[in-house]
Amino acid sequence: MSKNKLSKGQQRRVNANHQRRLKTSKEKPDYDDNLFGEPDEGIVISRFGMHADVESADGDVHRCNIRRTIRSLVTGDRVVWRPGKLAAEGVNVKGIVEAVHERTSVLTRPDFYDGVKPIAANIDQIVIVSAILPELSLNIIDRYLVACETLQIEPIIVLNKIDLLDDEGMAFVNEQMDIYRNIGYRVLMVSSHTQDGLKPLEEALTGRISIFAGQSGVGKSSLLNALLGLQKEILTNDVSDNSGLGQHTTTAARLYHFPHGGDVIDSPGVREFGLWHLEPEQITQGFVEFHDYLGLCKYRDCKHDTDPGCAIREAVDEGKIAETRFENYHRILESMAQVKTRKNFSDTDD
């Protein structure tokens, strides 16, 4: 999904070079090999510029340079690295990342200027955090779910701040969340303030690498602090009592370990997933309850709106597909078209 797609032959050569490094780590170096120790396995816990922090098997963190032959390196990558030795002047030499293991998954986001950019690697699940304050937005949840389905990374929906609900409000929110439970998504109701519901969430995170996604103000950082036992400093986006707006903060993507087991990558790049780079067919596939009806419409070019003989529209009318989800599907398509129009207009100005 890179901006300049490699040919099959080029990709084979890149993969072959990486495999040689993984096996031997003895190709011609861009650093003096005498400065480094034996190759070891590690995981990237943060990346900045041409340096990365790599955690070794014993839990120590090492600042490393990155070989120029490595095309892409992000937080969560599993790597072969070598520790730096003590230089003659008594100065410790940084370690070096020699090669990157094949990724099981990669989280990406679109960028107007750089194409699709990787954010994190080897993610097992995306935790979609929403809240009743400043507003429970099913449209935002649906956007995240489309991104998860497109990336083929399992989502979990977490509704935070349930301590602010009375019985009537809880019943309404549960009715809204049943829309997602009924199509196979896992939904957890929690409060980072009272810590209600944290135990099931801890169990869902154990033994997996997760990334939390959510708009400013939903309590994502407060929730992470509660799960981490306040052992780490993750900036909190508090909600103003007057405006209801979250305070914007930015940090580098970093991997943390939960005390109960499992890891989380905290990244500012997943506040909101852009979908404008996707094709309409990918958005349609991102709504899992549509799958049984695709190909059953009267016309092959059906837009799944007011077209006669639309199987998806009929399923909505019969109550088999939630009308809210159907409406959000079209809102997403409309927003994509608007963004692409603005992008094309901007491109013509350059």
Curated annotation (Swiss-Prot):
Annotated InterPro entries: G_CP_dom, NA-bd_OB-fold, P-loop_NTPase, Ribosome_biogen_GTPase_RsgA, RsgA_GTPase_dom
Domain (CP-type G): give its ranges. Answer: 104-273
Which SUPFAM superfamilies would you find in this protein's record? P-loop containing nucleoside triphosphate hydrolases (SSF52540)
**What do the Gene Ontology cellular component annotations say?**
cytoplasm
Q: Where does Zn(2+) bind?
A: 297, 302, 304, 310
An example of a GO molecular function for this protein is: GTPase activity
Q: Which cofactor does it need?
A: Zn(2+)
Keyword vocabulary terms for this entry? Cytoplasm, GTP-binding, Hydrolase, Metal-binding, Nucleotide-binding, Ribosome biogenesis, RNA-binding, rRNA-binding, Zinc
Q: Summarize where GTP binds, as residue positions.
A: 160-163, 214-222
Entry-linked HAMAP family: GTPase_RsgA (MF_01820)
UniProt function note:
One of several proteins that assist in the late maturation steps of the functional core of the 30S ribosomal subunit. Helps release RbfA from mature subunits. May play a role in the assembly of ribosomal proteins into the subunit. Circularly permuted GTPase that catalyzes slow GTP hydrolysis, GTPase activity is stimulated by the 30S ribosomal subunit.
Enumerate the PANTHER family for this protein: SMALL RIBOSOMAL SUBUNIT BIOGENESIS GTPASE RSGA, SMALL RIBOSOMAL SUBUNIT BIOGENESIS GTPASE RSGA 1, MITOCHONDRIAL-RELATED
Q: What is this protein called?
A: Small ribosomal subunit biogenesis GTPase RsgA
Which organism is this protein's natural source? Escherichia fergusonii (strain ATCC 35469 / DSM 13698 / CCUG 18766 / IAM 14443 / JCM 21226 / LMG 7866 / NBRC 102419 / NCTC 12128 / CDC 0568-73)
